[in-house]
Amino acid sequence: MESMAVATDGGERPGVPAGSGLSASQRRAELRRRKLLMNSEQRINRIMGFHRPGSGAEEESQTKSKQQDSDKLNSLSVPSVSKRVVLGDSVSTGTTDQQGGVAEVKGTQLGDKLDSFIKPPECSSDVNLELRQRNRGDLTADSVQRGSRHGLEQYLSRFEEAMKLRKQLISEKPSQEDGNTTEEFDSFRIFRLVGCALLALGVRAFVCKYLSIFAPFLTLQLAYMGLYKYFPKSEKKIKTTVLTAALLLSGIPAEVINRSMDTYSKMGEVFTDLCVYFFTFIFCHELLDYWGSEVP
């Protein structure tokens, strides 16, 4: 008799249908689902920027309904679960109600937290913006000051170099105009020009019919490269021009400029040799054609 009484107290009532015991939990679950759907829809509208005309009244009504629901949930007491087991079956209605209530409370708390994160108060956003702007302003001010100092130092150093180069140019111009310092041809330079002229005569007289005229010239240039170390070297004065001054001011090292100028001078010497070689060859060719036409 006692077991039957416990069963009737903790289980279902005899006059109520079987589905009416779970109606309260189902209602709470349905309310919770609707709230989540409404919250998600509102968040999407906020993100996308859509605002309905009656959005303010709806938000106020929704906040009031949320407060009422939370009060109801707090007022509801968790049903006690009997420890007795009737006919080997555990009492499940109390546990389901308890789980539903706890899940609902957690869901409302999570929803409130998400709302607070997604829609922060205007004062906090303004404070964050001001702090970010201040930090960025400090960083930009420091970087601008450092950049201005570095740029000023670099400008002063280049200005000093430009003044030195200007003095060198001014000192070199009068000497060039007076003609006191004349460029002296070194012995190796004269030897190169004479050798190119003689080679052109020999090629026109003997080799032109059987060999290309460029092969002897290239062979002569290779021979000059080997004979260069046996001739006395003359000191070459490097002139300061506007181009070298501009290169120095642009930050290129002086060693690189000297090497490039040395390379260009060697290329100029080879080009001069080639011009002498071709001029002599063509002159000899024209003379031979003229003499051949006169002789019967």
From Swiss-Prot:
Name the UniProt key words of this record, in alphabetical order.
Congenital disorder of glycosylation, Disulfide bond, Endoplasmic reticulum, ER-Golgi transport, Host-virus interaction, Membrane, Phosphoprotein, Transmembrane, Transmembrane helix, Transport
Q: Which InterPro entries match?
A: CAMLG
Predominant localisation class: endoplasmic reticulum
Example of a GO MF term: ubiquitin protein ligase binding
Q: Where is this region: Disordered?
A: 1-79
Source organism's superkingdom? Answer: Eukaryota
Look up the signal peptide feature and give its range. none
Instruction: Please state the pathology the record ties to this protein.
Output: Congenital disorder of glycosylation 2Z: A form of congenital disorder of glycosylation, a genetically heterogeneous group of multisystem disorders caused by a defect in glycoprotein biosynthesis and characterized by under-glycosylated serum glycoproteins. Congenital disorders of glycosylation result in a wide variety of clinical features, such as defects in the nervous system development, psychomotor retardation, dysmorphic features, hypotonia, coagulation disorders, and immunodeficiency.
Assembly information from the UniProt record = Component of the Golgi to ER traffic (GET) complex, which is composed of GET1/WRB, CAMLG/GET2 and GET3/TRC40. Within the complex, GET1 and CAMLG form a heterotetramer which is stabilized by phosphatidylinositol binding and which binds to the GET3 homodimer. Interacts (via C-terminus) with GET1. Interacts (via N-terminus) with GET3. GET3 shows a higher affinity for CAMLG than for GET1. Interacts (via N-terminus) with TNFRSF13B/TACI (via C-terminus). (Microbial infection) Interacts with human herpes virus 8/HHV-8 protein K7; this interaction modulates intracellular calcium concentration.
Q: State the protein's name.
A: Guided entry of tail-anchored proteins factor CAMLG
Q: Give the organism the record lists.
A: Homo sapiens
